[in-house]
């Protein structure tokens, strides 16, 4: 069992890693606030590498490409691409909420 301080430390560390990922790989420093927050949420849930690299097809993801081009609305619309866990689209409600949040910019 974790203490409250251990939970807080892990949360801080995980959030910092997700924000660093978005800044490093997705032009996060140039991104409007709402897209940055939505992408950070996705990175926290999906993992940094899986958000920018398609391991199965061995190429950059479309969401990564849109971020590189600073096409923020197009990037936001790619969030639902990451809806699967264990082969089932159980993450779709979360991704749709992130997409809606992202598009508020």
Describe these PLM feature segments.
Residues 6-13, 19, 48-105:
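Long, amphipathic alpha-helical surface segments
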Residues 17-57:
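Active-site nucleophile-His-acid catalytic modules used for acyl/amide transfer and hydrolysis
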Residues 1-4:
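Acidic/histidine-rich, surface-exposed loop or edge segments in extracytoplasmic proteins
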């Amino acid at each position: 069992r974790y203490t409250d301080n251990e939970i807080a430390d892990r949360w801080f560390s995980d959030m910092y890693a997700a924000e660093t990922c978005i800044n490093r790989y997705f032009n996060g420093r140039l991104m409007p606030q709402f897209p940055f927050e939505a992408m950070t949420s996705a990175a926290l849930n999906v993992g940094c590498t899986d958000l920018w690299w398609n391991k199965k097809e061995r190429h950059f993801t479309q969401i990564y490409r849109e971020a590189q081009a600073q096409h923020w609305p197009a990037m936001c619309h790619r969030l639902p691409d990451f809806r699967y866990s264990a082969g089932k689209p159980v993450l779709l409600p979360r991704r749709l909420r992130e997409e809606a949040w992202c598009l508020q910019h």
